[in-house]
């Protein structure tokens, strides 16, 4: 199958345009080469990028796809002059919204927008610092301020999920690893026991868990499939015993897990 190049262009980090572009591209079975170009925030950078896109178009029989989330109209128009198929999310929706709302778009520059978003940034960083300070049961200091506490066996996906909750939603997320001693106890671990209403369990298929642990400690009891089966079974028994909500991480992305946790625990994003 011929390979087409897809450019993801933004005047900021590019996360939004990648997500929206992927949502569209996932509907098609195509062979793609990806190129990410964040921080295209000046006419000079835009012209340089146009040269790259045009050079790619000349080398290929397939027109490049250009996904753009650039706010500035001047920069956006420069990128549109390239030989690629330009798909701008602002061009697609701003006109319709302006007509419906009866007002013109503000066309904030990235610099002004970053100043306006200072409060959101501060909330995100505060949540991230909290999550890092309460990763893997490292501290119970100020644990009462956690909005959710993920518990599960080692390598079940607690840390990446907490980090995503903090960065994407501004949630103060802590996590605690269930040790063999915890799993044999009829009680909740002492550190998290006072916060039962904030607990959310993560489980994982034993086979997947064993594979992940083998990468960390090959041929160890820790990674043995029987150990993994026992720990997963004991963890699920704990979740049932204390009627804790939980989710299986095996076939869920971090994004899907985060949304599920937000909905199940009735959490509100902080920005």
Swiss-Prot record:
- Give each disulfide bond as a residue pair: none
Its Enzyme Commission number?
Answer: 2.7.11.33, 2.7.4.28
Q: Record's Pfam families?
A: Kinase-PPPase (PF03618)
Q: What one GO molecular function would you report for this record?
A: phosphotransferase activity, phosphate group as acceptor
Keyword Kinase present in the record's keywords: the answer is yes
User: Mind telling me which InterPro entries this protein's record contains?
Assistant: Kinase-pyrophosphorylase, PSRP
Q: Which residues form a coiled coil?
A: none
Residue numbers binding ADP: 152-159
Keywords assigned by UniProt, alphabetized? Kinase, Nucleotide-binding, Serine/threonine-protein kinase, Transferase
Q: Which reaction does it catalyse?
A: [pyruvate, water dikinase] + ADP = [pyruvate, water dikinase]-phosphate + AMP + H(+); [pyruvate, water dikinase]-phosphate + phosphate + H(+) = [pyruvate, water dikinase] + diphosphate
Query: What biological function has been recorded for the protein in this entry?
Result: Bifunctional serine/threonine kinase and phosphorylase involved in the regulation of the phosphoenolpyruvate synthase (PEPS) by catalyzing its phosphorylation/dephosphorylation.
What the entry lists under NCBIfam families is as follows: PRK05339.1
Family annotation (HAMAP family): PSRP
Family listed? Belongs to the pyruvate, phosphate/water dikinase regulatory protein family. PSRP subfamily.
This chain belongs to the protein called Putative phosphoenolpyruvate synthase regulatory protein
What organism is recorded for this protein? Answer: Dichelobacter nodosus (strain VCS1703A)
Tell me the classification of the organism that encodes this protein: Bacteria, Pseudomonadati, Pseudomonadota, Gammaproteobacteria, Cardiobacteriales
């Amino acid at each position: 199958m011929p390979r087409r190049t897809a450019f993801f262009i933004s005047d900021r980090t590019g996360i939004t345009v990648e997500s929206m572009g992927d949502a569209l591209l996932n509907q098609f079975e195509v062979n793609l080469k990806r190129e990410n170009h964040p921080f295209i925030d000046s006419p000079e950078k835009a012209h340089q990028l146009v040269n790259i896109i045009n050079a790619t178009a000349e080398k290929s029989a397939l027109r490049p796809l250009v996904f753009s989330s650039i706010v500035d109209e001047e920069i956006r128009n420069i990128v549109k002059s390239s030989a690629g198929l330009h798909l701008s999310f602002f061009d697609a929706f701003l006109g319709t919204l302006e007509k419906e709302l009866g007002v013109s778009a503000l066309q904030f520059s990235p610099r002004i927008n970053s100043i306006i978003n200072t409060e959101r940034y501060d909330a995100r960083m505060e949540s991230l610092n909290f999550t890092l300070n309460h990763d893997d049961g490292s501290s119970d200091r100020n644990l009462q301020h956690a909005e959710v506490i993920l518990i599960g066996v080692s390598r079940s996906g607690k840390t990446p999920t907490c980090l995503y909750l903090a960065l994407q939603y501004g949630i103060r997320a802590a996590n605690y690893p269930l040790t063999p001693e915890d799993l044999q106890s009829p009680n909740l671990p002492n550190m998290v026991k006072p916060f039962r209403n904030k607990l959310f369990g993560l489980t994982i298929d034993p086979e997947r868990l064993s594979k992940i642990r083998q990468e960390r400690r090959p041929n160890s009891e820790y990674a043995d499939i029987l150990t993994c089966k026992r720990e997963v079974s004991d963890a699920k028994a704990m979740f049932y015993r204390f009627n804790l909500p939980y989710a299986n991480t095996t076939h869920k992305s971090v994004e899907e897990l985060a949304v599920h946790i937000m909905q199940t625990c009735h959490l509100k994003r902080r920005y």
